[in-house]
């Protein structure tokens, strides 16, 4: 029903799309993609982005570090990561911002500002969506409450399904694509999944309320109030996009800071550098140009729980990856595989694909008959080390709470949304 409701939004073009990991969400389904024609009454809807604005994934690749070499040191590495990575609800981050002026630099500069302040290297920005910074951000469109929530959380993982996971490449499907990505069987990687924390949540809350009140002024009626929306070109639409871009920059800076904390751990414990393969959001609305009915049109592409998947030779790709397409990073669960895919030509869903396994049990259902300690012990028997802040949080994220990620990936591959490159298996997981 949510996919059908999205299809009624003013200005929608082509279709309302559901990715293979689709499940129920706020307004839009999670795993939903829709684009609206910016110049023909197209709207923007915060429900099409979600509360965790710019939630996304980045993958770090261990330079010359093999799974067998890491294995004896893995417990020590996980203990160090446990201490180095702030996480949990309301947790303070690794970067203590001195004032709101510095926060505003983060909101407009994203990962680029973090790198300029010494938290990373220039190559990191080449491997980030939009070079690590989304243009059009305006902190003036953000409430004091949202700014206050963001001030103390930069450089923290959060809770829920957010994680930092040490992984190893288990299988390579496309050696030609895997080579420039630095992926070979046994290669150690680190996947980071988090977003814009309380700041992004508050921005969504604020602008949904504003749009609910504003829709009448634009003559808009929607079948579900959670689909509150306004024209992209309206003052309300522009205000949301400016605030959303600021949250996107916060999310990118957040992952950049966690990257540096992880690099320090690996440098100290293994002497191995970690190179960034790619960083991409899966909760975002972006103004893009796509062919619509034979003409190039400016459209607002909503991707909620959906990963951008650019094809080979797209102008936004870094030169080293242009021939193979954008790396698409799709995590599984604590006990299952994650995947690296690559974008393909001909993707009908505005170059979008799945973003994860897709939840099938609510957090309450998942935790009802399972203890976090039992899950931790079960995973330990399989050689997977879990470090969490709460037993309930681990129980809520048990592998059985999600769809079979292998099936989600196969559906993405077979339907022409992306192609499989490599399969990664978990070695250790830091959970919020």
UniProtKB/Swiss-Prot annotation:
Active site (UniProt): 355
Needed co-factor(s): Mn(2+)
Induction comment: A member of the dormancy regulon. Induced in response to reduced oxygen tension (hypoxia), low levels of nitric oxide (NO) and carbon monoxide (CO). It is hoped that this regulon will give insight into the latent, or dormant phase of infection.
Assigned keywords, A-Z: GTP-binding, Ligase, Manganese, Metal-binding, Nucleotide-binding, RNA repair
InterPro entries assigned: RtcB, RtcB-like_sf
Cofactor note: Binds 2 manganese ions per subunit.
Keyword Manganese: yes
GO MF: GTP binding; metal ion binding; RNA ligase (GTP) activity
Gene Ontology terms describing biological process: RNA repair; tRNA splicing, via endonucleolytic cleavage and ligation
EC number: 6.5.1.8
Binding site for GMP: 161-165, 282-283, 331-334, 338, 355-358, 431
Reactions the enzyme catalyzes: a 3'-end 3'-phospho-ribonucleotide-RNA + a 5'-end dephospho-ribonucleoside-RNA + GTP = a ribonucleotidyl-ribonucleotide-RNA + GMP + diphosphate; a 3'-end 2',3'-cyclophospho-ribonucleotide-RNA + a 5'-end dephospho-ribonucleoside-RNA + GTP + H2O = a ribonucleotidyl-ribonucleotide-RNA + GMP + diphosphate + H(+)
Protein family according to the UniProt entry: Belongs to the RtcB family.
Note: Ligation proceeds through 3 nucleotidyl transfer steps, with 2',3'-cyclic phosphate termini being hydrolyzed to 3'-P termini in a step that precedes 3'-P activation with GMP. In the first nucleotidyl transfer step, RtcB reacts with GTP to form a covalent RtcB-histidine-GMP intermediate with release of PPi; in the second step, the GMP moiety is transferred to the RNA 3'-P; in the third step, the 5'-OH from the opposite RNA strand attacks the activated 3'-P to form a 3',5'-phosphodiester bond and release GMP.
Function: GTP-dependent RNA ligase that is involved RNA repair. Joins RNA with 2',3'-cyclic-phosphate or 3'-phosphate ends to RNA with 5'-hydroxy ends.
Protein name: RNA-splicing ligase RtcB
Protein's organism: Mycobacterium tuberculosis (strain ATCC 25618 / H37Rv)
Taxonomic path: Bacteria, Bacillati, Actinomycetota, Actinomycetes, Mycobacteriales
The gene coding this protein: rtcB
